[in-house]
Amino acid sequence: MNVLIDSFLDYLRYERNYSEYTINAYFKDLQQFEDFVKEKKEGIFVPGEVDTDIVRNWIISLLDNKISPVSVNRKLSSLKSFFKFLMKQGFVSVNPLRFVTGPKTKKPLPTFVKEKDMEELLDGDGFDEDFEGVRDRLILEMLYDTGVRRSELVGLQDTDIDYDAMLIRVTGKRNKQRLIPFAERLKNLMLAYTEVRNREVDAGCGWFFVRKNGEQLSTGILYTIVKKKLSDIPTLAKCSPHVLRHSFATSMLNNGAELNAVKELLGHSSLASTSIYTHTTFEELKKVYHAHPRAKKEGGYYGR
């Protein structure tokens, strides 16, 4: 791997406090670009010799290989961050990406679970009463009730939960911490889970969510658990932990929460990220409209 790429990854790791998952994504994108340049430049990759044309040719190559515009733009973002780093460090004098734009994409609206469907799932008998069943039910409850990311959920330790204050301390992206309140119902579920866990599993590691062997639950296992349970909802097009994060935000806004408050609970750095959920409030707008006396009238002048 190029020494400058290595330096950039260290910068992300130690100065920006990016997660290893994010750093690995940057690494793969930059390695892919390095391989492309080497193929065109007889095995040589010198960042200072990269020009706009080769970046654009890389984009064309990705699209020709059926890489989606969304993925191409993500890769391009990684490359832009890399060259911004090189510019700041004085390794390059010109940024070859300053005039490069990615392919246009249609921004899909977030998938979310309807409140009725979620209630039927969580209050139903689709979970066993053993350790894993109690744990899995709580996982879905916490994702839906708090809006945390799956990495944040598996990263919870017992000491992060204050049952008296009814607050959860969550460590998010770049190690930023935030406090999320929880209700009495969720408190009872968490206490019930810890009782079963401490009785049936050797959980001395300190992690809140663990496997049967007592080790910390991984994001991969959590994803599988959520996907399996959400697949019981036939109308749901996508089944993932992030869908429950979308559902949390949607429910909060539909029930009158302010956008800024939802932003803080989700751990977003800007309102722009949170505003994608405002589309769902159209359901409430329709209800308001249909409360209008003229909206209740059937027919109309020409429909008499």
Which residues fall in each region the model found?
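Conserved catalytic core of the tyrosine transesterase superfamily
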Residues: 1-304
